[in-house]
Amino acid sequence: MSRQVSLDRLRNIGIMAHIDAGKTTTTERILFYTGRTHKLGETHEGAATMDFMVQEQERGITIQSAATTCSWKDHRINIIDTPGHVDFTVEVERSLRVLDGAVAVFCAKGGVEPQSETVWRQADKYGVPRLAYVNKMDTIGADFFRVIRMMEERLGARPVPIQIPIGAEDTFRGVVDLVRNVAIMYYDDLGKDIREEPIPEDMRELVEQYRTRMIEAATEADDALMEKYLMGEELTVEEIKRGLRKLTVECKINPVCCGSSYKNKGVQPLLDAIVDYLPSPLDIPPVQGTDPETGEPAERKADDNEPFSALAFKVVSDPYVGKLCFFRVYSGQLKSGSYVLNATKGKRERIGRLVRMHANHREEVEVVETGDIAAAVGLKDTGTGDTLCTDAAPVILESMEFPEPVIQLAVEPKTKADQDKLSTALLKLAEEDPTFRMFTDPETGQTIIAGMGELHLEIIVDRLQREFKVGVNVGKPQVSYRETVRGRVENVEGRFVRQSGGRGQYGHVVINLEPAEPGSGFIFENKIVGGVIPKEFIGPVEQGIKEALQNGVLAGYPMIDVKVELVFGSYHEVDSSEAAFKIAGSMALKAAAQKAQPVLLEPYMRVEVTVPEEYMGDVIGDLNARRGRIEGMEARGNAQVIRAQVPLAEMFGYATDLRSRTQGRGVYSMQFDHYEEVPPNVAKPIIEKAQGKA
């Protein structure tokens, strides 16, 4: 079967940017000009084709990366629109993993904004070639050349403009195509009346300067071009494009275009640049993986005749077809109705139907080929990051890394009916989003949800109520405290005696209690000599002590890191029983803990904050105010990484706080490190609240 579109004419690209740089509008325009939509969708009207979740249309931001396919000049372009909010970086991570190239959209006024830095670093990590598009050239304060400077300074990029704007703000009329050396003028706001004209006189000098710079960059691609240029010969348009394309694919330069998507200016030249400079699946190195049977490295080339391999990068619950699994085909072909092996989980799966997505419309297809991005219906066990392949040639492709969730809160169903729906809904959401976790708190029995930030959890709760119709009450984020003792006490007794007619109860133990090494939990030592307590009653004593440790004497939190020695006791021939000794053990522990200087412990987190140098003092001061201890600092690129230990109780709301302190340019990660004593002034209100005094 011959391919519909040859591999060299396929482009898998992502569109990435800061919030409000206009990337969803840009995608909308691309779809309009490539004939996929017949009506322009405006983000601010809540009608954008790519933003199809209710939450996205209300907030005017993109949360889930929607995938869509379109055609331009005999090329097929698969586009993934990615969110620009820091709480959703996982969506960006996973789309970058399966793309071959990307378009970074910058706002002509805001330039390189904080999220642009984060997204750019993620693209660097995956080695994704990209071109830049400076949007909103018609807004007040638009400055194309300032954005170019910011790309160099903040991103360490090497931008090479292939267009420069004609006019700016309300006089923005078109662009100069530096490669073909012509002016493209727009005479209306619908992008219908477009004319090619000679370059305006007053811009000749500027155009010459930037064109020379672009041609010099192109000649670095190969010696033949360099030689021709140095001999003073003119390079042809084809040669310039070939040179720029080679360097872009190698991630050495970033061609830059400009326009105003909203006013329909500059979108067609951007499409031309996507086709001209971004890589096809043939331009990128073969994908690497491992053979699950031998553990040896394996690779798959982009070729329809190679064995089938694909990476699942997103799972969504669709109200009509159930579970939709998005995947990128790296090699071979796949027909609908066939069986595949999920090599990551070692399970065979049947592909029910194959669909190519256009935002939220689907088009059923019989077969998908190398380089395609499509979705499958019917994969029950496949999750994000799993590899799909043939039984005959299994391979596990490199998966994705997802950060651990850093914030958690309790959710409770409002009614009994909600109770049953809650866990099903949460499981579905956890399947879609690898950075969202849910678990039951063993101490309170509450359902806890954890995620990447407050906005992330807010949207999860919102989706529970809207999509899954589950009513929930949301608690405040909580901390799990612990208790321990600081002093040693000896010969504390626990005596449980009931002897008033009939079979009595008799248990009597004497214990010593002392602090144990941090992290050791609970140590029990039997020092009974001469059989004062028979062997069969020793186990129940230990059991009773363990149960008593679950509820500490200060505030009812579990006690950890204590050592108990059982030193003496007595028993009664008839009345002693396992139950009596269990109760005696727990009574002894409670009495001993009261006397052994009990203290409250809190979880300390290992926190890493990455911030631009100018905010460092402010951020360190703030961490100190949060009872944090700074452990060290190091430079990473043009940012500083601060490492600190901070109590979890002080970290609530930190994401929002850091964002405002650093104008959104700071990012942080944290994970649990150890438990440590709570200072008396902080512990007092916690203990009083637990004892019901507060």
Swiss-Prot record:
Gene Ontology cellular component annotations, sorted alphabetically: cytoplasm
Family: Belongs to the TRAFAC class translation factor GTPase superfamily. Classic translation factor GTPase family. EF-G/EF-2 subfamily.
PROSITE patterns in the record: G_TR_1 (PS00301), G_TR_2 (PS51722)
Task performed by this protein: Catalyzes the GTP-dependent ribosomal translocation step during translation elongation. During this step, the ribosome changes from the pre-translocational (PRE) to the post-translocational (POST) state as the newly formed A-site-bound peptidyl-tRNA and P-site-bound deacylated tRNA move to the P and E sites, respectively. Catalyzes the coordinated movement of the two tRNA molecules, the mRNA and conformational changes in the ribosome.
Organism: Symbiobacterium thermophilum (strain DSM 24528 / JCM 14929 / IAM 14863 / T)
Chain residue ranges for the region called Disordered: 284-303
Pfam families hit by this protein: EFG_C, EFG_III, EFG_IV, GTP_EFTU, GTP_EFTU_D2
Gene Ontology BP, a term: ribosome disassembly
Broad class of where this protein is predominantly found: cytoplasm
Protein name: Elongation factor G
Protein's cellular compartments: Cytoplasm
Binding of GTP, residues: 17-24, 81-85, 135-138
Domain tr-type G: 8-282
Single GO molecular function: GTP binding
Keyword annotations: Cytoplasm, Elongation factor, GTP-binding, Nucleotide-binding, Protein biosynthesis
SMART domains tied to this protein: EFG_C, EFG_IV
